């Protein structure tokens, strides 16, 4: 059952809260370790994260779909694609240049072996890419590597959900998350799900 795969409703306080327990029942296990999580090509996950910067989830998904119809989500294809083609998909110049730099660095091996590195080392490596900051690296840790304990306190959706459900101000989010170590990615995922729940 999903509950058996959960990182222990009894093992940490996440599901002791009635609101979070309800989200767990509705949405099932979060897609991070130790639960099964999708294995996806690192370049594609990062490209999607760059596209998603400062956009709503829905707008980002539409833009990524349009982009990948024009340019396949591989480093080689993005290296060869003219900048104008990336702009034609609806990307800002800054995002188009970031994706070109990501493609070049991926071809040089920057994305190799990330799954063997600690979270901090992954962030350090990824933020060498133009236009990739802490938020984009955190999204990759979660959705590219399935890391269970990422707490992206700068994320606007997370801030909105935490304020709505728990009355937590943005500056209090780091301390609020401490109680949920080592499964803060799971907490973030349920908070995001809450934004699309009645």
Regions found by a protein language model. Name each.
Residues 51, 118-162:
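Catalytic DNA-binding helix-loop module of base-excision-repair DNA glycosylases/AP lyases
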Residues 57, 77-78, 129, 166-171:
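A short linear-motif detector with a strong N-terminal bias
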Residues 1-117, 121, 175-198:
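N-terminal polyanion-binding entry modules of DNA glycosylases/AP lyases
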Residues 90, 131, 146, 166-167, ...:
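Glycine-centered helix-boundary capping/hinge motifs
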Residues 154-178:
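C-terminal end-helix/capping segment
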Residues 70, 102-109, 125, 129, ...:
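Mid-sequence acidic-hydrophobic segments that form the walls
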Residues 109-113, 134-136, 151, 169:
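Short, structured loop/turn "capping" segments at alpha-beta junctions
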């Amino acid at each position: 059952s999903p509950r058996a795969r959960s990182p222990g409703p009894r093992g940490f306080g996440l599901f002791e809260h009635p609101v979070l327990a309800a989200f767990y029942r509705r949405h099932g296990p979060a897609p991070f370790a130790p639960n099964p999580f999708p294995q996806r090509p690192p370049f594609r996950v990062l490209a999607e994260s760059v596209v998603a910067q400062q956009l709503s989830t829905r707008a980002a998904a539409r833009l990524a779909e349009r982009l990948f119809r024009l340019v396949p989500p591989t480093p080689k294809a993005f290296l060869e694609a003219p900048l104008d083609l990336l702009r034609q998909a609806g990307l800002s110049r800054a995002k188009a240049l970031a994706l070109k730099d990501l493609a070049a660095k991926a071809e040089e091996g920057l994305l190799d072996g990330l799954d063997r590195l600690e979270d901090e080392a992954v962030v350090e490596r990824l933020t060498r890419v133009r236009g990739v900051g802490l938020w984009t690296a955190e999204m990759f840790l979660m959705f590219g590597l399935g890391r269970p304990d990422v707490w992206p306190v700068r994320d606007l959706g997370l801030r909105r959900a935490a304020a709505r459900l728990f009355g937590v101000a943005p500056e209090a989010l780091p301390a609020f998350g401490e109680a949920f170590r080592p499964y803060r990615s799971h907490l973030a995922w349920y908070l995001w799900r809450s934004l699309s729940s009645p």
